[in-house]
Curated annotation (Swiss-Prot):
InterPro entries named in the record: Ribosomal_bS16, Ribosomal_bS16_CS, Ribosomal_bS16_dom_sf
Keyword entries, A-Z: Ribonucleoprotein, Ribosomal protein
Organism of provenance: Geobacillus stearothermophilus (Bacillus stearothermophilus)
Identification of the protein by name: Small ribosomal subunit protein bS16
Domain of life: Bacteria
Family named by the database record: Belongs to the bacterial ribosomal protein bS16 family.
Annotated Pfam families: Ribosomal_S16
Single GO molecular function: structural constituent of ribosome
SUPFAM superfamilies: Ribosomal protein S16 (SSF54565)
GO BP: any one term: translation
Cellular-component GO terms for this entry: cytoplasm; small ribosomal subunit
PROSITE patterns noted in UniProt: RIBOSOMAL_S16
Length: 89
């Protein structure tokens, strides 16, 4: 089972709100997911990003691949922390 960290679209028309979820890569964008690890609101000024660092790092260590969320994770500094954990720096 290939697991991905991706965005699940919520909200109304023209007012998107996203949940950052861990899901099987075969399930649809807004379908089944394993766990919610954060939220992303692009409508707010500035855009609001809330991610549970412990959960995100846990899933990255277990092999979850980030999709479009890579830029959101790097803005929060999570990819750098994961890299340091993985390579022991």
């Amino acid at each position: 089972m290939a697991v991905k960290i991706r965005l699940k679209r919520m909200g109304a028309k023209k007012k998107p709100f996203y949940r950052i979820v861990v899901a099987d890569s075969r399930s649809p964008r807004d379908g089944r997911f394993i766990e919610t690890i954060g939220t992303y609101n692009p409508v707010a000024e500035p855009a609001e990003i809330k991610i549970d660092e412990e959960l995100a790092l846990k899933w990255l260590q277990n092999g979850a691949k980030p999709s479009d969320t890579r830029s959101l994770l790097s803005k929060q500094g999570l990819l750098e922390k994961f890299h340091n954990l993985k390579y022991g720096k």
